[in-house]
UniProtKB/Swiss-Prot annotation:
Its EC number is 3.1.1.5. Residues 1-34 are lumenal. InterPro entries: Acyl_Trfase/lysoPLipase, cNMP-bd_dom, cNMP-bd_dom_sf, LysoPLipase_patatin_CS, NTE, NTE1_P-loop_dom, PNPLA_dom, RmlC-like_jellyroll. One of its GO terms (cellular component) is endoplasmic reticulum membrane. It comes from Drosophila willistoni. Keywords: Developmental protein, Endoplasmic reticulum, Hydrolase, Lipid degradation, Lipid metabolism, Membrane, Neurogenesis, Phosphoprotein, Transmembrane, Transmembrane helix. This is Neuropathy target esterase sws. A motif (GXGXXG) lies at residues 971-976. Phospholipase B that deacylates intracellular phosphatidylcholine (PtdCho), generating glycerophosphocholine (GroPtdCho). This deacylation occurs at both sn-2 and sn-1 positions of PtdCho. Its specific chemical modification by certain organophosphorus (OP) compounds leads to distal axonopathy. Plays a role in the signaling mechanism between neurons and glia that regulates glia wrapping during development of the adult brain. Essential for membrane lipid homeostasis and cell survival in both neurons and glia of the adult brain.
Length: 1481
């Protein structure tokens, strides 16, 4: 920094008199010739030293002369003889004693004072003794504790209790769902062990595709054969992996087994493979139909999630996944003859009526159909119709092996057009003025379908697709249309003729005009089975993008992509019907069409009577898929990982990539020294390991599951095959990787710097599931959850779940191990439909609390900030249960008290597992003690109001969803007063501030805002501090000898300390950081904790003016952070460190490590990149630094200083612009800062703002009000222009301006998980009589037995292998010995905490109940009850809870009670249960 500029600014800012101008001019002239000043100082120093030496020598000579005179006097007095003189004995003893003691003291000092650091301590003691320094009391330091080993290491557990072959089979068949032990043992009986040599075929083309193959040892290569005879590898199957196809599984179960057409598997080395025939499942399904239905549903769900997610969202394949049209399909539409109402002749006339514009059946087929024919088959092509059963749908040539007619096809696939002359299968039509009477079964039910009904009295006016109906066309009886639709749907559902009466009451017919939307993508209310009778339906899908939010529900029609057409005789809607999820497509009518449909509730009622129709529906979905999907089905794998399990490890070969379907993954790198660091975290929808796979390099990190997670594995072979077939995939991936690398380049600046916190790593701060845990029973957890839920509703759909809500939706016994699949599936669907799900834990270690820990991406530990910080037993158990899950501390403060956060370090030091903390100011209603019912009633009204976007709850909500808004304040001396005006303008613009970072003067202003959050108070304190900086006499008293800096920094420290006091960064309301330049380690440092005033002072230590601040942590010297990054404990210390201007103020010594800190402007004067790394999604960066003059004079190859002096002093010559020595040094110091600033300006996450304050100098603190007004006016105009241009929405685009409507804050009843097995097989809800006993048993167990990956077999039943089967022998399969499938650790834990075994009577009763078949557990319904159940299913009327949240209608026969009474009843029952548990314990 130029000294001349500073002194001029000081003079101009404080004095306007003639004397001050003359004084400043005189000083300027003197400093200009600084070389002469230094020479003069040197001469004076030499003269002073010479005089000092001369004086000391003169004094020594005088002393010697005096001694000589004294000796001469003694000699003369004794006559010149000194032999008679001697010392006295006591003088001798005293002399020798002192001498001995002096030697002993030196020896002891060497013994006890030597060692490491002795010299340094001795020098410090000597300096204190000389300079009389006082060691001030150091503040409380934050204890730095390394995370536990489990946080960064994977879980490596053996499976000694399970034979390897049985374990591999368990892991392979779990893709079909969860199987109980008896079912698994029955499947084991059908296994076969195959031994293959290298080169042997496991299966090849034309072999039956009817088995599941599990590799026990060795390696199998799965490849496809092309038409030219070449092969292309899909994947390599290694030990423990399997080869299976979900689509082939459905084919086998439906009685239509297929064969391998293009896929072949060959052993690459000697291998042992376990073969499980798919026919083995049929035996199990016959005995347990609910298992069959559940397996079909699981297959459909995973088909939709794994295949469609991988191929559609990431590879850009849409229309290629389904067949564009069905060829060689013969459709039969039956028209039942009604002899009671019409004669045979009239029926024959009606059957020959035209379906399109008067075309007769004779014209279509070339012959007259006999009247005795009960069905009229028609084909799409003009050849004559034949009476034949429906043929299977042929597949469109979308394969990996066939030639691609359009290699650039991707999203723009040309589908065959179906024009008006397309044949229709419904040969009946209505006359425009017909008068047929419809039956009672044809009553039109109006849902969300907005299309005209079939006229009054059964007739209607409908335009057919071939043209307008002729006026004289015959009239069709609606009963014949209805019977035709019933017969067609009966055959599509695979029902025999005698079961037509089952579906007849539920079949509805609609006449559609062109462009009528039947159902939209993402809609779950209007899911139906649609059968096209005439016309054509078009199926669309939104343009998929890997970065697109799953919660987006509104999009224009232009973004929809045409997938395929549904022609007459085809059915659509089976996938959504079987999965129970929302529709994945948008279906519209392409022209005038007639469709028959059955609603979802009706289909489920039909399934109850005929469960086998799920196979026909599933087979219909499979037939529609292209061969490409089947080939991908062999290669794509579904993987379930428990918490701690590794996806892949560092230095392993990379042969696949993974897609996170649910859960959370953590990437950890192991450095050469063995230390492990977090590289990043991945959430739902992220792509893991894609870079290593494409570049064919080994894995650079280890990726493990933070919680239970589901992944889709995409092998490299499949990726290459799709790449060759569809080049559009390359474009899709290039776009995806470009965005990823661009983001990593923009955030690379401060990553990995010394002193950077863990949050500086590129960890995604966007969570899908959040668990809320109270520290004590005094914490108002329910009101806190409601307030957070209220703020989250402004961002997107959110769900709040408690144990009471889950039991109310899914039954009281939902937390039992038998209901594991139903609970996990329901929770997974809720997480998919909402951007975030809140899991409110119980106040004890209940099964629900265990479930919350397993489901959570992050755990919020909620406590009261004004209470004790001690850790409770319950909180320690939470850390033990979820060691890898990130935990954040939330401290609540009542709004009525004006107290600020304090003692936060004590909270954090007591909880080393906490990675972040939040201070939340709560309104009065949160701490009001009320009953659960009154709390629910209160927040049912609060949730209808608009949330306060500036509250701490909204700030916490934005942090959890990855929408935080950061404010970065740059350095610039007195020009930083513009920050105050900009803060006021930001507040008036309605932009919330969630995080603040600053450098130099920006560190001071940002710390004031985080501490006060009131613009008036911040302005007053900033003005007072600026006024102190204008007192020149205090600055003169602070002058010192300019070895390190011009000022000692004592008075400057006092001004910052008086502003903040002894406040720590952890005690600020808003997350804050400051940046300094560490001259000890030659890097920048980010301070997010510690002494506030010290690090602000360090960030303001400009070189040459203030000495660097010595970091008390490690002793490093810190300078102004602007030298490396001009935009980014006790608070004042780090503020002081951030203001340590080199040369003016001395570097500030960090009290933690002793590093010297200087102003952060030397490294980064606008640290917006640091803010982005800390989790801010949108950033406002305000730059008030000085700008260097780039218009310099070209003086040639050499430069004479005398010529510059002549140009400067000669008023008659033109001035030249050449930098002097201080200016050159300043430009060199700011080189990295300028580069960092340009990157910030070009980033897409930052809004760079620079107020017009260039005319103000760095030390013009006297112009505080003027500079502040300039910043305010500029900021107000800037944000108004942004609002007019529509760019202000990037800072509040997530915020819902409209208040939420009633019932919108919970969506449990709008859409919920549908368990087909429970619906079809009528499995009743079993409510326990004594719920306290259930709670006591559940609380003792450690979680669930959720997945087979942790299942271990008891050693008691392990016997040697018998025959070509699994290691489980026949005796084991038939024995009644209970197999414990838990892991070793969990079993030992459960063994220690298992309660005593129940009595003999209870055990016998339990066994008796288990032996009853599932289908006989339900009491038969009476006719009246059945009618009431049917009406309930058809209407699907939701019930609203009293607290404003919706609940799901359960499949029970109990009458519906009042919502308020339900809440009150559940609360009283919960209190009784807790009392019983406490009593029993």
């Amino acid at each position: 920094m130029d000294v001349l500029e500073l002194l001029r600014a000081s003079a101009n800012g404080c004095y306007n008199t003639i004397f001050s101008d003359a004084w400043s001019q005189y000083v300027s002239q003197q400093i200009t010739s600084s070389l002469y000043l230094y020479i003069a100082l040197g001469i004076l120093t030499v003269l002073f030293v010479a005089w000092f030496i001369y004086f000391k020598r003169l004094a020594r000579l005088r002393l010697r002369d005096e001694i000589a005179r004294s000796l001469n006097a003694v000699t003369s007095a004794s006559g010149g003889d000194l032999r008679g003189l001697r010392f006295r004995k006591r003088d001798k003893m005293l002399f020798y004693g002192r001498r001995m003691l002096r030697k002993m003291k030196n020896v002891s000092g060497q013994m006890y004072s030597s060692g490491k650091g002795y010299k340094r301590r001795a020098v410090m003691r000597f300096a204190r003794r000389i300079l009389q320094l006082r060691r001030e009391n150091m503040p409380l330091e934050m204890r730095t504790v390394e995370p536990p080993a489990e946080y960064l290491e994977e879980t490596i557990e053996g499976s000694d209790r399970v034979p390897p072959d049985a374990l591999y089979m368990l892991q392979s068949i779990r893709i079909f769902g969860h199987f109980e032990k008896p079912v698994f043992l029955k499947l084991c009986k059908h296994t076969q062990v195959l031994e293959l040599m290298a080169g042997d075929y496991l299966f090849k083309i034309t072999d039956a595709d009817d088995s599941v193959y599990i590799v026990q040892s060795g390696m199998i290569n799965v490849y496809i054969s092309n038409a030219d005879g070449s092969t292309l590898s899909l994947k390599t199957v290694r030990k423990g992996e399997s080869v299976t196809s979900l689509l082939s599984f459905i084919d086998v179960l439906s009685g239509n087994p297929s064969y391998y057409k293009t896929v072949t598997a060959k052993a690459m080395e000697k291998s042992v493979v376990i073969r499980l025939p798919m026919q083995a499942f049929e035996e199990v399904f016959r005995e347990n139909p609910d298992v069959m239905i559940r397996v079909i549903q699981v297959i459909m769900i995973r088909l939709q999630r794994v295949l469609f997610t991988a191929l559609r969202n990431y590879l850009g394949l849409n229309a290629e996944l389904v067949q564009n049209h069905m060829r060689n399909k013969s459709i039969t539409i039956s028209g039942h003859l009604n002899s009671q109402s019409q004669s045979s002749q009239s029926m024959r006339q009606q059957t020959t009526a035209t379906a399109t514009g008067g075309t007769s059946a004779t014209a279509l087929g070339g012959q007259q159909l006999p009247a005795a024919v009960p069905s009229l088959p028609l084909q799409r092509q003009p050849p004559p119709p034949t009476i034949a059963p429906p043929l299977r749908h042929s597949r469109e040539e979308h394969t990996l092996s066939g030639p691609n007619p359009n290699p650039n096809s991707g999203n723009n696939v040309q589908l065959p057009e179906v024009h008006g002359d397309a044949p229709n299968i419904d040969i009946y039509h209505q006359q425009q003025h017909g008068g047929s009477t419809s039956t009672g079964n044809l009553s039109t039910r109006r849902g969300s379908l907005v299309q005209p009904s079939i006229g009054g009295g059964g007739g209607g006016s409908t335009a057919q697709e071939g043209g307008c109906a002729a006026a004289g066309a015959p009239t069709i009886d609606m009963r014949l249309i209805q019977s035709s639709a019933v017969e067609s749907l009966r055959k599509e559902l695979g029902l025999p003729n005698e079961d037509a009466h089952i579906i007849e009451p539920f079949v509805e017919v609609r006449e559609l005009e062109p462009n009528v939307t039947l159902i939209t993508e993402g809609n779950a209310d209007d899911v139906c089975i649609w059968f096209v009778m005439t016309g054509t339906l078009a199926v669309y899908q939104g343009v998929a993008d890997a970065t697109r939010s799953s919660t987006a529900t509104t999009k224009s029609d232009k973004s929809d992509l045409l997938i395929h057409f549904v022609h007459p005789g085809e059915i659509v809607g089976g996938l959504a019907m079987l999965t129970g999820e929302a529709s994945a497509y948008t279906i519209r009518s392409r022209n005038n069409s007639r469709v028959a449909y059955i609603r979802r509730a009706a289909i489920y009622q039909i399934m109850r009577q005929r469960p086998r129709i799920v196979l026909d529906l599933g087979n219909g979905v499979v037939r529609r898929l292209s061969p490409l999907v089947r080939q991908c089905d062999y290669a794509l794998d579904w993987i379930f990982l428990e918490s701690g399990r590794a996806v892949y490890r560092q230095d392993e070969s990379s042969d696949s990539t993974y897609i996170v379907l649910s859960g959370r993954m953590r990437s950890v790198i192991t450095n050469p020294g063995g230390k492990k660091e977090i590289v990043g975290e991945y959430g739902k929808g992220d792509l893991v390991g894609i870079v290593e796979m494409i570049t064919e390099t080994s894995r650079t990190t280890t990726v493990m599951a933070v919680r239970d997670s589901e992944l889709a594995k995409l092998p490299e072979g499949l990726f290459n095959a799709i790449k060759l077939r569809y080049p559009i995939v390359v474009t899709k991936l290039i776009s995806f990787l470009s965005h990823r690398f661009l983001g990593s380049m923009q955030t690379r600046g401060s990553t990995g710097a010394p002193g950077a916190p863990v949050e500086a790593n590129p960890v995604t701060h966007k969570y899908s599931t959040v668990a809320l845990v109270p520290i004590t029973d005094e914490v108002p957890l329910t009101p806190f959850t409601y307030e957070l839920y209220h703020s989250l509703c402004a961002i997107g759909p959110v769900l709040r779940l408690t144990s009471e809500v889950v039991r109310k939706q899914l039954g009281q016994n939902i937390f039992e191990a038998a209901n594991e699949y139903r609970l996990t599936s329901w929770l997974a669907q809720q997480e998919d439909r909402n951007i975030i799900t809140l899991y409110q834990c119980d106040n004890s270690l209940s099964p629900w609390t265990h479930r919350c820990m397993r489901q959570a991406d992050v755990i919020l530990i909620v406590g009261l900030g004004d209470r004790s910080h001690l850790v409770g037993k319950f909180e320690r158990e939470i850390d033990r249960l979820a060691m890898r899950t990130q935990k954040e501390l939330v401290l609540l403060y009542p709004e009525t008290t004006n107290a600020k956060p304090a003692n936060t370090l004590s909270w954090l030091n007591a909880r080393p597992w906490v990675t972040k903390h939040h201070h939340v100011l709560c309104v009065k209603r949160i701490f009001t003690r009320k009953s659960q019912y009154r709390i629910n009633d209160l927040y049912s009204r609060v949730l209808l109001s608009e949330p306060n976007m500036h509250s701490d709850f909204s700030r916490l909500a934005r942090w959890l969803t990855g929408n935080s808004i950061g404010l970065v304040l740059g350095g610039g001396g007195a020009r930083g007063a513009a920050h105050i005006g900009m803060l006021k303008a930001i507040q008036e613009a309605g932009i919330p501030i969630d995080m603040v970072g600053g450098v130099s003067i920006g560190a001071l202003m940002g710390a004031l805002w985080c501490s006060e959050r009131n613009i008036t108070t911040v302005t007053q304190k900033a003005r007072q501090w600026s006024k102190k900086m204008t007192k020149w006499f205090l600055q003169l008293l602070d002058l010192t000898y300019p070895i390190t800096s011009m000022f000692s920094g004592r008075e400057f420290n006092k001004t910052i300390h008086d502003t903040f006091g002894d406040v720590s960064i952890e005690d600020l309301w808003i997350p804050y950081f400051t940046l300094t330049t560490d001259i000890t380690a030659s890097c920048h440092r980010i301070h997010t904790n510690g002494s506030l005033w010290r690090y602000v002072r360090s960030s303001m230590s400009l070189s040459g003016y203030m000495p660097p601040l010595c970091d008390p942590k490690d002793g490093h010297l810190l300078l102004d952070g602007g030298y490396v990054n001009n935009l980014p404990g006790h608070l004042w210390r780090y503020c002081r460190a951030s203001m340590s201007i080199a040369g003016v103020f001395p570097p500030f010594c960090d009290y933690r490590d002793g590093h010297l800190l200087l102003d952060g402007c030397y490294t980064n004067n606008v640290p917006a990149d640091v803010m982005h790394n800390l989790g801010a999604a949108h950033i406002i960066a305000i730059d008030v630094g000085s700008q260097d003059d780039t218009d310099l004079t070209n003086y040639g190859d050499d430069l004479s200083g005398w010529w510059l002096l002549y140009k400067k002093w000669n008023p008659f010559t033109s001035p030249v612009k050449v930098p002097d020595l201080p200016d050159i040094q300043s430009r060199l110091a700011y080189v990295s800062c300028v580069r960092q600033l340009e990157e910030v300006k070009n980033s897409d996450y930052c809004e760079y703002i620079r107020p017009p304050i260039d005319k103000y100098k760095t030390l013009a603190f006297g112009s505080f009000d003027e500079i502040r007004d300039v910043g305010y006016v500029f900021g107000k105009n800037y944000f108004e222009s942004m609002a007019k241009a529509g760019r202000l929405g990037r800072f509040n685009q997530w915020f819902n301006k409209e208040p939420p409507k009633r019932g919108n804050h919970a969506s449990l009843n709008e859409y919920t998980f549908i368990d087909l097995a429970q619906i079809v097989c009528k499995l009743p809800e079993t409510y326990a009589v004594n719920t306290a006993e259930i709670f006591s048993e559940d609380e003792d167990c450690d979680g669930y037995i959720s997945e087979p990956s942790t299942l271990n077999t008891d050693r008691r039943i392990q016997v040697p292998r018998a025959g070509n089967s699994l290691s489980l022998s026949e005796a084991e399969m038939d024995s009644d010995v209970e197999i414990d499938f838990r892991s070793d650790s969990k079993k030992d834990k459960a063994t220690q905490s298992t309660p005593p075994a129940p009595g003999k009577d209870n055990e016998d009763k339990t066994d008796a109940v288990d032996r009853i078949p599932l289908l006989t557990l339900e009491r038969p319904l009476t006719d009246q009850q059945q009618q009431h159940s049917d009406e309930t299913d058809e209407q699907e009327t939701p019930r609203a809870m009293k607290d404003g949240t919706n609940t799901m209608t359960t499949q029970t026969t109990s009458p519906t009670t009042d919502a308020g009474s339900e809440w009150a009843g559940s609360e009283s029952e919960l209190e009784k249960e807790n009392k019983n548990v406490n009593t029993k314990n």
